[in-house]
């Protein structure tokens, strides 16, 4: 399998996001990399599903709450930016204050 660097990055985000989902399902609080991976993976998948940038910007704020992450993590993530592939091309999705 010959993947481009971009494809490798997306695969890494997906894998880390899947791990974060499993840990969250077991009742564990997520750390910084896990929280970023979970939100990023969800945004990439949402773009693949055909959601708009505006929908994803809102959706990204609904994925995690303060109770689901370790102390201090929400303050470490003021925003998340993901370059996602949409049916009409690649666009930058920015989610401000993703963990409320």
Curated annotation (Swiss-Prot):
Main localization (coarse): cytoplasm
Top-tier EC class: hydrolase
Pathway, per record: Nitrogen metabolism; urea degradation; CO(2) and NH(3) from urea (urease route): step 1/1
Cellular compartments annotated: Cytoplasm
Signal peptide: none
InterPro entries in the record: Urease_gamma, Urease_gamma/gamma-beta_su, Urease_gamma_sf, Urease_subunit
One Pfam family of this chain: Urease_gamma
Transmembrane segments: none
Key words of the record: Cytoplasm, Hydrolase
Annotated GO CC locations: cytoplasm
Reaction(s) catalysed by this chain's protein: urea + 2 H2O + H(+) = hydrogencarbonate + 2 NH4(+)
UniProt record, GO biological process: urea catabolic process
EC number, as in UniProt: 3.5.1.5
GO molecular function: nickel cation binding; urease activity
Summary of subunit composition and partner proteins: Heterotrimer of UreA (gamma), UreB (beta) and UreC (alpha) subunits. Three heterotrimers associate to form the active enzyme.
Similarity annotation: Belongs to the urease gamma subunit family.
Protein name, entry field: Urease subunit gamma
Organism: Pseudomonas paraeruginosa (strain DSM 24068 / PA7) (Pseudomonas aeruginosa (strain PA7))
């Amino acid at each position: 399998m010959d993947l481009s660097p971009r494809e490798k990055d997306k695969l890494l985000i997906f894998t880390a996001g899947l791990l974060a989902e499993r840990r969250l399902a077991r009742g564990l609080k997520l750390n910084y990399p896990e929280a970023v991976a979970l939100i990023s993976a969800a945004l990439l998948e949402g773009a693949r599903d055909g959601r708009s940038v505006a929908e994803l910007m809102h959706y990204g704020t609904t994925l995690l709450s303060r109770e689901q992450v370790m102390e201090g993590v929400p303050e470490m993530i003021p925003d998340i930016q993901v370059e996602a592939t949409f049916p009409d091309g690649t666009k930058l999705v920015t989610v401000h204050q993703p963990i409320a």
